[in-house]
Regions:
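Q-loop/switch helix immediately C-terminal to the Walker
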Residues: 135-153, 165
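Conserved structural motif at the start of ABC-family nucleotide-binding domains
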Residues: 47, 62-64, 179
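Hydrophobic anchor residue at the start of the ABC signature
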Residues: 196
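Pre-NBD coupling/linker segments of ABC/ABC-like ATPases
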Residues: 2-51, 123, 154-162
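Conserved ABC ATPase signature
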Residues: 156-158, 182-186, 190
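Conserved ABC ATPase "signature" region
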Residues: 145, 160-178
Length: 263
């Protein structure tokens, strides 16, 4: 069900009036009940790779990989070090320079013949590499808001309703009180939570999480895992998650892919 702009805004502002302590169950309910904005695609095939090969010099990273991700599936991506997990995610996110030479479709169309920004509009993404490269000393809320436009920094000033959804997700991740603090003054764990909020902020159709619990303390690992599980219960959401640890996977995983390193 798609809600009106007013209904969505009323939902977002309601959290300000609630009790400051929120149980994980309440947190999950808030995420599941978040009104949809109607910016959905309706293709059954969200990602389709047809005999995709990636080589760097004389080293083959991916060799004739066929892989289809259907709408609503939740994939666990695992494999040996150097097997190409991060490379595969960069292809799906349209961040790999070799993407355009490969037979890849996203959202049911010829993905790479579309504007890269059209592709990214549907994707939320976070990874340890992104965290290491993120050196913008903007207020934390502007880092989160940059996920609305898929920029590293903010190039457009967010509208009030956009700031409301940013604050809402920062509250979900437990960092609302840090919204005005410069990103580089946050602890490493707080930075990771801000980048996670950035990945979720546009309620993406495809959520790509590369080691999302990396660098978090025990409490926040539990919190983020619950957030991921709740997000997966939203209608037609698709997820690809990389982790080295089975215990980090949410109970909502439906499919698995394991990459072997090419010798």
């Amino acid at each position: 069900e798609v809600f009106s702009k007013m209904e969505r805004e009323a939902y977002l502002t309601a959290f300000r009036n609630r009790d400051a302590t929120t149980s994980f169950d309440e947190l999950q309910k808030r995420i599941i009940d978040l009104p949809y904005d109607g910016n959905n695609y309706d293709s059954d095939e969200v990602v389709k790779l047809n005999k995709v090969s990636i080589r760097y010099g004389d080293r083959t990273i991916l060799n004739e990989l066929d892989w289809t991700v259907h709408r609503g599936e939740k994939w666990a991506l695992s494999g040996e070090n150097g097997a190409g997990k991060s490379t595969l995610l960069s292809l799906v996110c349209a961040d790999n320079p070799q993407s355009y030479a490969c037979d890849i479709s996203l959202s049911g169309g010829s993905g790479y013949r579309e504007s890269i920004w059209e592709i990214k509009k549907h994707i939320g993404y976070v990874s340890p590499e992104m965290h290491r490269a993120y050196l913008k000393n903007l207020p934390a809320i502007e880092i989160v808001a940059s996920g609305l436009h898929d920029s590293i920094g903010l190039y457009k000033r967010p509208q009030p309703e956009q700031m409301a959804i940013c604050e809402w997700w920062m509250d979900i991740f437990g960092i609302a009180e840090l919204k005005d603090k410069p990103f580089l003054q946050l602890s490493s764990g707080e930075q990771r939570l801000a980048l996670l909020a950035r990945a979720f902020v546009k309620d993406p159709e495809l959520l790509i999480l590369d080691e999302p619990l990396h660098g978090l303390d025990t409490y926040n690992r539990r919190r983020v895992k619950k957030i991921i599980e709740a997000f997966c219960h939203r209608k037609d959401k698709t997820m690809i998650m990389v982790t080295h640890y089975e215990s980090e996977l949410p109970g909502t995983i439906t499919d698995r892919i394991f990459l072997k390193r090419n010798r």
